[in-house]
């Protein structure tokens, strides 16, 4: 049967069977509820499949449909990726029974794996979507392992079978060999063309188990997401694990101990729709006029104030930031606005961590060059870029972001070990005994013809080769252990460039190792610029210092005096450039006369320049800072 025939068959049968509006009514029993998520490597068609499920179940009318319907942020549509998990409730009729399907959409990029883990904790099953033309990718494996840790029922789906290069049989065999999952009944579909969508919906109903029915137990609901609404306060997304919750209930957040009244509860279909009550196994939202972002944290447990649960739900493992940088407002008057924006964004983005001294207080970071800002931690470079863009777009802030760094362990001479993520706070060489840096294990999947360039990249980044396995005849897994600091620059871009876009990667932190690291300072006219300081391996210090000094020479405006630009390790200058002085022609009005008059004018000019150099201050323009910080990200 041709693709056209398959498409005709599906689109004719689906409306008669399942084109029903969601009305907010609850299934008569929890046996009719199914909670599932979609997991996939980035760009394998996950958001397109979610769109088609929403359309064909009648959850969203065709005239209201748009690409990446669940991706609410402009950033997500512009980049074509999912950043935030989203939830949607669908209704599907099968064997004359109205099933309630709760979809929790997940991101696919490695930086947002924490969002994936939160989604999976609220589900009983998952659709594993694999591109039939590309096969198993690195993040596919990582997502499968997350699903297995949560003991989920996994349904393999081979997407994009309409592409000319699709090889569903080969990809099914790949999944069996690499993951060890039976793919004899893997669903073959094309989310774009609507092929196989009915089979996916049927499989969700028949293969994914319903939630456990514990409706008579005290209320326990797990918060898996939240965001701040300026009119309604904190809006909480949760899954009811035990008991039930209805509008008007007095509730308590077990971690914070704060009590509120549930002003509004409802379901996400995918827009918010009020209902009177939610039962065990269901997914919904809650509004209770919560004004403090600290009162309702992701991973907390909701229970009734009058009949509290004995113990809270396990929640989630804390996300560990791997990359740190400074965020500074270009306009110093926006410092407090930046603080408020970070607090609100942290509520919605639980993986964003501002470095704190005390619980729930941001630690300001000051710089003589850029003023006051904050030191923040991120899961990766993409996560860092997304947070910066969200702050600028959603909160109208203009920001400078410093070069990213990782968390180092500094062993001091007195035997104490301290953590350092800010190069300007690194203890002096005389006070420290050694520095340890974080290492990661990176698994790169690549076609066999690009193995050489991929291994060269690993060696260039101080990597240690561990193993190589051919997962199929034409694709190999290359495993390296390398410093995390070598990945926070352009590693991913280089990986894609050297493999012509075909390689993918997945990494995990494996611990700390001692390295020969030094602090590289940049001095302009003898004054250190803290914002440009960085920690580098001694072998790379000269090349990084040379690149930074040359870039600064291009960007800093010339002065009336000579300005030296130096890269230093301690008191030792390892790279130097100089801005030549702008020379004023003081002899232009001397049309003759005694030579001593000219010598006197030249001597006076030289003395003035010497005095100016001693007391003069070189202002580095913001454009120069931004260009050099961008260069640091590339050369580190």
UniProtKB/Swiss-Prot annotation:
Enzyme Commission number(s): 3.6.5.-
Residues binding GTP, per UniProt: 40-47, 105-109, 159-162
Function: Promotes chloroplast protein synthesis. May act as a fidelity factor of the translation reaction, by catalyzing a one-codon backward translocation of tRNAs on improperly translocated ribosomes.
Name under which the protein is recorded: Translation factor GUF1 homolog, chloroplastic
GO annotation terms (biological process): positive regulation of translation; translation
Coiled coil keyword on record: no
Subcellular location(s) per record: Plastid, Chloroplast
Domain of life: Eukaryota
Top EC class of this enzyme: hydrolase
Note: This protein may be expected to contain an N-terminal transit peptide but none has been predicted.
Domain tr-type G: 31-212
Keyword presence, Plastid: yes
GO CC, any one term: chloroplast
Reactions mediated catalytically: GTP + H2O = GDP + phosphate + H(+)
Keywords attached to this entry: Chloroplast, GTP-binding, Hydrolase, Nucleotide-binding, Plastid, Protein biosynthesis
Predominant cellular place of this UniProt entry's protein: plastid
GO molecular function: GTP binding; GTPase activity; ribosome binding
Xref: InterPro entries: EF-4, EFG_III/V, EFG_V-like, EFTu-like_2, G_TR_CS, GUFP, LepA_C_sf, LepA_CTD
Pfam families noted in UniProt: EFG_C, GTP_EFTU, GTP_EFTU_D2, LepA_C
Family according to the record: Belongs to the TRAFAC class translation factor GTPase superfamily. Classic translation factor GTPase family. LepA subfamily.
PANTHER family for the chain: TRANSLATION FACTOR GUF1 HOMOLOG, CHLOROPLASTIC, TRANSLATION FACTOR GUF1-RELATED
């Amino acid at each position: 049967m041709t693709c056209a025939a398959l498409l005709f068959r599906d689109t004719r049968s689906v409306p008669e069977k399942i084109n029903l509006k969601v009305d907010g009514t609850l299934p008569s029993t929890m046996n009719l509820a199914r909670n599932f998520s979609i997991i996939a490597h980035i760009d394998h068609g996950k958001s397109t499949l979610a769109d088609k499920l929403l359309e064909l179940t009648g959850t969203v009318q065709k005239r209201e449909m748009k690409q990446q319907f669940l991706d609410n942020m402009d950033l997500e549509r512009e980049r074509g990726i999912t950043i935030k998990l989203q939830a949607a409730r669908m209704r599907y009729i099968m064997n004359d029974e109205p099933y309630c399907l709760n979809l929790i959409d997940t991101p696919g990029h490695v930086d947002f794996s924490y969002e994936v883990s939160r989604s999976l904790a609220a589900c009983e099953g998952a659709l594993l979507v694999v591109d039939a033309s590309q096969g198993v990718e690195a993040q596919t494996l990582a997502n499968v392992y997350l699903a297995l840790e949560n003991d989920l029922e996994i349904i393999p789906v081979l997407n994009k079978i309409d592409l000319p290069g699709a090889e569903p049989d080969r990809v099914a065999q790949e999944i069996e060999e690499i993951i060890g999952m039976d793919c004899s009944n893997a669903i073959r579909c094309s989310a774009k063309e609507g092929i196989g969508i009915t089979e996916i919906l049927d499989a969700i109903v028949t293969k994914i188990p319903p939630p456990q029915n514990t409706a008579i137990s005290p209320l326990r609901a797990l918060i898996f997401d939240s965001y701040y609404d300026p009119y309604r306060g904190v809006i909480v997304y949760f899954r009811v694990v035990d008991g039930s919750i209805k509008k008007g209930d007095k509730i308590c957040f077990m971690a914070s101990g704060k009590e509120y009244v549930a002003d509004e509860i409802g379901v996400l279909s995918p827009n918010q729709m009020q209902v009177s009550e939610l039962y065990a196994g269901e997914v919904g939202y809650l509004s209770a006029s919560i004004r403090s972002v600290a009162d309702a944290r992701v991973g907390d447990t909701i229970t009734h104030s009058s009949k509290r649960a004995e113990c809270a739900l396990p929640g989630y493992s804390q996300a560990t930031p791997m990359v740190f940088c400074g965020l500074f407002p270009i306009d110093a008057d926006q410092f407090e606005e930046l603080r408020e924006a970070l607090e609100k964004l942290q509520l919605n983005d639980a993986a964003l961590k501002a470095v704190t001294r005390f619980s729930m207080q941001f630690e300001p970071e000051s710089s003589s060059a850029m003023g006051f800002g904050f030191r923040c931690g991120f899961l990766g470079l993409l996560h860092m870029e997304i947070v910066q863009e969200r702050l600028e777009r959603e909160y109208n802030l203009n920001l400078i972001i410093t070069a990213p760094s990782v968390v180092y362990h500094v062993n001091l001479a007195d035997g104490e070990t301290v953590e350092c993520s800010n190069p300007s706070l690194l203890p002096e060489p005389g006070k420290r005994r050694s520095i340890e840096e974080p290492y990661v294990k990176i698994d790169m999947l690549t076609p066999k013809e690009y193995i050489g360039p991929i291994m060269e990249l690993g060696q260039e980044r101080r990597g240690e080769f561990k193993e190589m396995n051919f997962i199929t005849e034409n694709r190999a897994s290359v495993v390296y252990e390398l410093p995390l600091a070598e990945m926070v620059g352009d590693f991913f871009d280089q990986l894609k460039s050297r493999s012509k876009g075909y390689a993918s990667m997945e990494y995990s932190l494996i611990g700390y190792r001692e390295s020969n690291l030094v602090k590289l300072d940049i001095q302009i006219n003898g004054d250190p610029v803290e914002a440009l300081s960085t920690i580098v391996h001694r072998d790379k210090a000269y090349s990084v210092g040379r690149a930074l000094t040359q870039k600064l020479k291009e960007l800093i405006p010339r002065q009336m005096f000579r300005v030296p630009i130096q890269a230093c390790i301690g008191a030792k200058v390892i790279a130097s450039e100089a801005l030549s002085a702008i020379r004023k022609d003081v002899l232009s009005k001397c049309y003759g006369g005694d030579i001593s008059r000219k010598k006197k004018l030249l001597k006076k000019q030289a003395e003035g320049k010497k005095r100016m150099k001693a007391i003069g201050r070189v202002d580095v323009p913001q454009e120069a800072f931004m260009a050099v910080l961008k260069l640091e990200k590339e050369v580190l």
